[in-house]
């Protein structure tokens, strides 16, 4: 395998991190045992293991939320200054007798004018939560329903919308039950979560005690709450899915997973060669011989829909689901937002889209638009960005504006009528664009970078451009046309994809093949003493980033050293971009100030002109030259 082949390999960051710390085999084993209904009674041993803590530190260090502080005003950079041994010791001591630090509450405004309370734990508690999440996730993933899509690996809102469209198009389920759980995250029953975890096989009493304390952590300025999951914690989304997983399987058991005496399912082979289990004969037999109601659930976090075939069925399902949520999960339904929708006559909103069935030839097909509230939000956002662009008519301003437009296009491109919707938005902001940008921008046909923005060029839409002259050279920056977008139909989630099986990983991720696993293990098991946790974590990813090579030759343990491009005594840091692996003798040459030593090292190394140029640039950065 060549260097260029390696660069093209599919990479999933979380899985690559698992490889760095040899955690993947452990997680795979947990997933397999959970599938076999094993009871887990000693999970704390895995949670406080050295590899798991190092992996947790790496995962939260890369997380954007690590730059947000809790009640103790500490950030990830404060943990990064500790040695990796100190971090491990800290986590282990805290979990011996765990008591969470107070949680900071932050109110986030919602579209309806109300606020959503976020509970932000301290960075240390988030590190501990990450340690727990890494071990619990494979166990829970083995038990979760296959059509829940929120806060789960490899799944997205697009998969949930795609599943809803598929049910509308192919199964003739033309009624949908929309149920809104009243303030779900604030009303979750703590004792119910613990029981559900126990039934999933998580039966480590020490761990359950720790999670129980996390749920009852004091919220600064509010006190201790007896119910609810604090939004903002790393463990919160997983706990929310544990709660609602019972709902998923209850709905599924009413039709989809209903047991039959005879096995009607058949294995069929697609043209692509992929095998799948066909349940159509089972559903046909159930429809003919039982009075069961056809129903399928699609859920994203606490936002879910139940599709059914008639209004009478929908009414019964609505009442039954409402009663089940109250009796089993102790959750109330919001009557104002809960309803039954005839999809042939009305739209139903789901995750920022509105869906409806329209007649086409002799059948009904799903048509989708951007939801009305989201149309208004996008319009307001673009107007706000136009103001900023007028104040900063530069390359940076244009790139910021373009990133907003591109972000909206990428999310809403799966709507079948996305082009029509963005044309409406473009028309509504046209006067604002003209008034704000006409003086500093010229109007011309779009001239984007062909390789990166190819889809816009064929529209021939007039857009605004900003021209900058620098040393007699003119550079043109174009703003992206709002309406230049076409529909890209969403794809259903492939249930073969799984982070915790070898076959499932191969569909999305290629394992490291060029690096020496022996060297990688040595780097992991032998952190540099008196260096920070950030330094020791980055030296592992740096080794893999350089493909285990230096000057196209394999790095050897006894000859490889990490060099700070900008020395720490001159303001340098342990950040990844400030580090580079070099040969021991090259490292001496970089810091060398003696002419004789320099000459001797040059003769020994026999460097090419390209290598000498690189060494000189490193010498200049560290002040040796």
Language model segments and positions:
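Non-catalytic, polymerase-adjacent accessory regions of viral genome-replication enzymes
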Residues: 1-85
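Reverse-transcriptase-like RNA-dependent polymerase core
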Residues: 57-60, 90-114, 123, 127-135, ...
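Conserved polymerase palm-domain catalytic core
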Residues: 102, 146-147, 152, 159-333, ...
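Histidine-centered nuclease catalytic patch
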Residues: 180, 552-584, 592-598
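A conserved non-catalytic segment of reverse transcriptases
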Residues: 216, 221, 329-399, 403-406
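Non-catalytic, peripheral interaction segments enriched in hydrophobic/basic residues
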Residues: 393, 397-457
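Extended C-terminal regions of large enzymes
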Residues: 425, 437-530, 607
């Amino acid at each position: 395998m060549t260097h260029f082949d390696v660069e093209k390999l599919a990479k999933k960051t979380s899985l690559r991190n698992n490889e760095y710390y040899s955690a993947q085999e452990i997680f795979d084993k947990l997933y397999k045992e959970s599938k076999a209904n094993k009871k887990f009674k000693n999970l704390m041993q895995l949670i406080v293991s050295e590899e798991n803590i190092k992996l947790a530190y790496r995962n939260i260090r890369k997380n954007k939320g690590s730059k947000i502080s809790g009640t103790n005003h500490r950030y990830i950079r404060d943990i990064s200054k500790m040695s990796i041994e100190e971090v491990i010791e800290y986590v282990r001591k805290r979990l011996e007798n765990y008591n969470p630090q107070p949680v900071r509450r932050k109110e986030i405004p919602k579209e309806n004018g109300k606020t959503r309370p976020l509970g932000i734990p301290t960075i240390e508690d988030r590190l501990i939560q990450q340690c727990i999440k890494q071990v619990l996730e494979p166990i829970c993933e083995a038990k979760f329903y296959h059509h829940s899509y929120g806060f789960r690996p490899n799944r997205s809102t697009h998969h949930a919308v795609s599943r809803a469209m598929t049910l509308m198009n192919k199964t003739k389920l033309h009624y949908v039950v929309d149920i809104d759980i009243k303030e779900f995250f604030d009303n979750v029953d703590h004792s119910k979560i613990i029981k559900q975890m126990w039934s999933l096989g998580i039966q480590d009493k020490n761990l359950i005690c720790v999670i129980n304390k996390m749920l009852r952590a004091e919220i600064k300025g509010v006190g201790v709450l007896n119910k609810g999951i604090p939004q903002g914690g790393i463990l919160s989304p997983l706990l929310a899915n544990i709660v609602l997983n019972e709902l998923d399987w209850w709905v599924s058991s009413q039709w989809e997973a209903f047991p039959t005496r005879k096995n009607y399912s058949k294995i069929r082979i697609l043209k692509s060669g992929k095998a799948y289990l066909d349940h159509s004969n089972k559903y046909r037999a159930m429809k003919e011989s039982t009075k069961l109601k056809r129903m399928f659930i699609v859920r994203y976090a606490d936002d879910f829909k139940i599709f059914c075939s008639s209004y009478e069925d929908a009414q019964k399902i609505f009442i039954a689901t409402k009663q089940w949520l109250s009796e089993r999960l102790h959750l109330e339904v919001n009557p104002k937002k809960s309803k039954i929708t005839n999809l042939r006559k009305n739209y139903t909103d789901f995750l920022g889209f509105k869906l409806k069935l329209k007649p086409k030839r002799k059948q009904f097909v799903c048509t989708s638009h951007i939801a009305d509230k989201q149309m208004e939000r996008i319009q307001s956002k673009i107007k706000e960005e136009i103001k900023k662009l007028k104040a900063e008519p530069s390359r940076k301003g244009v790139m910021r504006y373009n990133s907003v437009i591109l972000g909206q296009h990428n999310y809403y491109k799966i709507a079948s009528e996305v082009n029509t919707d963005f044309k409406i938005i473009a028309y509504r902001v046209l006067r604002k664009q003209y008034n704000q940008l006409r003086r500093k921008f010229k109007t011309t046909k779009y001239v984007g970078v062909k390789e990166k923005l190819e889809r816009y060029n064929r529209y021939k839409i007039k857009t605004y451009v900003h021209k900058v002259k620098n040393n007699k050279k003119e550079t043109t920056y174009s703003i992206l046309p709002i309406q230049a977008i076409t529909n890209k139909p969403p794809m259903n989630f492939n249930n073969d994809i799984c982070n915790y099986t070898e076959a499932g990983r191969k569909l999305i991720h290629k394992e490291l093949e060029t690096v020496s696993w022996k060297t990688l293990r040595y780097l992991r098991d032998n952190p540099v003493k008196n260096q920070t946790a950030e330094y020791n974590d980055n030296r592992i990813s740096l080794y893999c980033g350089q493909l285990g090579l230096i000057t196209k030759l394999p790095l050897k343990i006894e000859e490889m050293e990490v060099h700070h491009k900008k020395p720490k005594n001159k303001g340098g840091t342990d950040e990844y971009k400030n580090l580079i692996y070099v040969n021991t003798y090259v490292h001496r040459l970089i810091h060398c100030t003696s002419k004789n030593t320099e000459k001797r090292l040059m003769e020994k190394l026999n460097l090419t002109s390209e290598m000498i140029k690189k060494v000189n640039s490193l010498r200049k950065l560290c002040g040796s030259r």
